[in-house]
Amino acid sequence: MNEPTYNYNDFLMPALADGQPDISIEISEITKKQWNQLIGIHEVVVYKDCRKLFPAAKFSVRGLDPALLYSVEICFDVLSPFTFSYNKKLEKWIPTKTPVNCQSSALSSMICETGDWFMNGDMDFGALNITSSHEKAKEKIEQNRIAVCLSSRTMYQIRVVLYEMQNDELIYLKETKFDEMIFITCTEYRGQVNRELKKSMNRFSRKRKYEISGTKCQRSKRPAKLPVESLDEKELKNAEKGIMSLLESSPSSPSYLYQYQYNSPQSIPSSIYDSLYPSSPEEYQMVHTFPQTDQLSPSFQTSPTVHYDFYNQQYYDNSFHENYFQSYNRL
C-alpha cells in the first residue's frame, strides 16, 4: 500500500474574502526582523507553566476610522493534521502519522480600543502567555491576563482578525496571516542556531537576565556534561583539584583555560519548507515518512574556538557575540 503524500499548501486555511482593501495589518519592523531570523527552523517551547511568546507578536494597523471602536483578536491556526518529531540524523522536524489532538485554532483574548489608538502605536501582544495546560491558561484568563493553550509537537501559524464594534456586536472586517509566524511547538529546543538566537535576543532568558541585572540565576538542574572527549581526563581532574593553588601562585593568569573545537551552524534555512520534509529517497528511507517536496537547504558550519574557565565555571565563545559568557549549569 502506497504511503499518503501531503503538500504544505494542503495544511493552509483558505483566506476569507477581503472586503476592506484600505485597511492593512502588518508586523512591526523589529518583530518581523526577529521572526525572519528564525524562519525555517523556528521552535517555540511550551510547558505547563505559562511563559511569554518569543519573538513577541506586535502588529501595526492602518486605514481605520479614528473615532470608531475596533477589536483585534490573535489566533493560532493548526497547519498540519499530524504531529511532528525531530529526526536527529537529518536534523529537521518530520511529520508523523499521529493525528493532532487539539482544536483547529486556539484563540487568545482580544484588544478593544479606538481606531486612533490602534494607528498611533503597535498592537502589542507581548504579554501573551503560552502554555500546554488548559487549567493554567484558564487561571491566567481569570486574572485578566492574555493566555492561550498550545499542544506540543504541533505546527501553528499566527493569524490576526480585525473587528468593528457596533452596539456591543463584533462586525468582521479583515484578517491577515503571516508566513513569518509559522512555528512548531516543542518541550526543548533542538536546533543549535535557534537556541543561540533565542538566548541572545530574548530578554526573558536566563542569560539575558544575567546580562541585564548582573546577578546569576540559581538553577536546580544538574550540570551539563563537559566535552570530555576533547579533554584529557587525568589532566581535567588535576586541574580541578589544584586550581586554587595555581591561581594563588599566578594571580594575573587567565584562570587556567582549556579549549576545544566544535561545529556550530552560522546560518539558518531561508524557507520553512526545506526544514519539514525529506529531500531525497535516502532520507525518506531513514525516516519512513512522506516523500520529498523540496531540495535540502545547504548547511553552513564553521569551527570557532570555545574556552572553558574551571574557576569561574563559564564558557567563553567569541564566535557568536563579543564577550559572550554562558553559565556552566546550562540547559
Curated annotation (Swiss-Prot):
Nucleus recorded as keyword: yes
Residues passing through the membrane, by range: none
Localization of this protein: Nucleus
A Pfam family the protein falls into: T-box
Signal peptide: none
GO cellular component, as recorded: chromatin; nucleus
Keyword Nuclease: no
GO molecular function terms listed in the Swiss-Prot or TrEMBL record: DNA-binding transcription factor activity, RNA polymerase II-specific; RNA polymerase II cis-regulatory region sequence-specific DNA binding
GO BP, one annotated term: cell fate specification
InterPro entries cross-referenced by the UniProt entry: p53-like_TF_DNA-bd_sf, T-box_DNA-bd, T-box_sf
Disulfide bonds: none
Ranges annotated as DNA-binding: 29-210
Main localization category: nucleus
Keywords: DNA-binding, Nucleus, Transcription, Transcription regulation
UniProt protein name: Putative T-box protein 36
Organism expressing this protein natively: Caenorhabditis elegans
Annotated gene: tbx-36
